[in-house]
């Protein structure tokens, strides 16, 4: 598989970039189907890669501020910035670096792991779109960039859509992440096992109910019952059931800081501002925040 765009990957993870530069990116999907992706340029920073037409940010949300600073040398007056990341509020940070009519935002519905340099393991959705994104503010430049990205993703084998209004799709991903990311990290279970347990499923329902209330108040109507029906389908259909989501990897495997502040923490903040009680999200945010601040003090069996 080769790319059909002039694409530069910039990452300070030197071993990862070196491996991709030498051999391409080994991309494993569907439990073992392997593709060797080639044709990339690589760099450890954006300092010397020139001005880009489009800059895509796919970092952890707690790394976005630093990534924006690092990307400054490749951002010109007509560069379109794109966030394809988990969490709420990423587009607001991009708008501070470029005008709203030059910012796209969205997210994917596929889980990923990076087990070693140059290798990515992904769990795509069983069917349908893998990536959804839209413009913060429509303009000829933003719409042209969105249409081109849609074409490139689709031609590359990643079904995606550039939406007039991406918010329903973004909220769907955010609520799914608010549900399974922290619960998997706290309970040490995969999504399928959380939903098989009466207590785990009960926790999921409470988180979803609060998130849907907040989403509705923010102008994106969602009902918890309909969302839970779709969530159960995704867990039972092989999309997210059999891997540990990123927050579980952060907490259980790598002892890293998580994205809790832009997931459940953001739901809690929105809830307070809107007068909507969010006790489950409040408690989950406190638990994960406590865990990630005290890795060095935790019991080691």
Where are these predicted regions, by residue range?
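Active-site-proximal catalytic alpha-helix in oxidoreductases
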Residues: 167-195, 199-212, 239
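Aromatic pocket-lining residues of Rossmann-like dinucleotide-binding sites
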Residues: 1-2, 177
